[in-house]
Amino acid sequence: MIRRIILTMAFLASLSLSAKDVNMGSWQIVPLPQQVKEMSSAPFRITAKTTIYYAAGDEKQKKDAGFLASHIKEVTGIGVKTTDKQAKGQIRLALNAGDTQSEAYSLVVNKNGITISATSHVGIFYGIQSVMKALPITRNVKSVSLPAAEVTDAPRFAYRAFMID
């Protein structure tokens, strides 16, 4: 009898040691981006005060920001707003001039926010997809976190297709 009690207590203790923060996202997503460099700094917390910034007058970015906001609401229950005014603690969508592939994107996540940058709207959309996949699926919480990281990705091929032989 004492042996069963000791085994039960040991089992319960081992469960508490392996418990993870279910409100923490992960960059182990499919398909895995070309480069994921996780940082040891503090994660970014998404709360009801978080906003998604898009460039004023850019209707495509505004639509993408709304898409991301609705997904965050759906999977976490946290209502984030979109805005064309910059502030701290935002998820920023940024178009940058550059010579990278049109569908390439980069993400920078730190305690101050998330920046999704690309040379085209398509790249921003794919960056948003990566953020959506990294979010934890949990409901009715006050905040979720994404680990600090630098993520870079681009399509491996210049075309997307499905072939059946």
Question: Can you say where each PLM-predicted feature lies in the sequence?
Answer:
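Extreme N-termini of proteins with methionine-enriched Sec-type signal peptides or N-terminal signal-anchor
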Residues: 1-2, 19
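Sec-dependent signal peptide recognition
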Residues: 2-8
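Hydrophobic h-region of N-terminal signal peptides that target proteins for export
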Residues: 9-18
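Contiguous, structured surface segment used for ligand recognition
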Residues: 20-160
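Active-site mouth loops of central-metabolism enzymes
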Residues: 161-165
